[in-house]
């Protein structure tokens, strides 16, 4: 997705060789037009898969996930990082480690909103080691639903996330693949010297 690559180049900030900050359009301030286009692109890629639900994790996955849900005309469900006191019924849960924050959270989804007839597209902002997507896939399995695919806005291809997801039998679609953050510079897959 050219517009996304342009945004990453123009507004992304390389923190170190493993962390890319995209607060200006995705993780803090949200570029709504760009997220609309992201959602539409995921729709075009998965429109024939019978998607019934979009699943993400709070907070940064919500913007691209809700835009995808709008295009699919299905609900967007997000896993919560803490069980709210209002959640009285059963839950599906998984442990998820955040690469960026270096923390582990137990995320929960109410069993009221995810069931065995659901065909789920998991959406996330970043793919690093794949822990978030694998954890969300575990929640889908607990519900006896089907994960149709994983949609990633920015993939750090130099980390093992894609390989881990594909080893788990999951279809991965990344809209922007970063090959390297070396030398304080973003290099995209296909642009390596």
UniProtKB/Swiss-Prot annotation:
Annotated binding of xanthine, by residue: 20, 27, 156
GO biological process, one term: XMP salvage
Keyword annotations from UniProtKB, A to Z: Cytoplasm, Glycosyltransferase, Purine salvage, Transferase
EC number: 2.4.2.22
CC annotations in GO: cytoplasm
Principal subcellular localisation of the protein: cytoplasm
Subcellular localization: Cytoplasm
Family (UniProt): Belongs to the purine/pyrimidine phosphoribosyltransferase family. Xpt subfamily.
Cited NCBIfam families: PRK09219.1, XPRTase
Quaternary structure and partners: Homodimer.
Protein name: Xanthine phosphoribosyltransferase
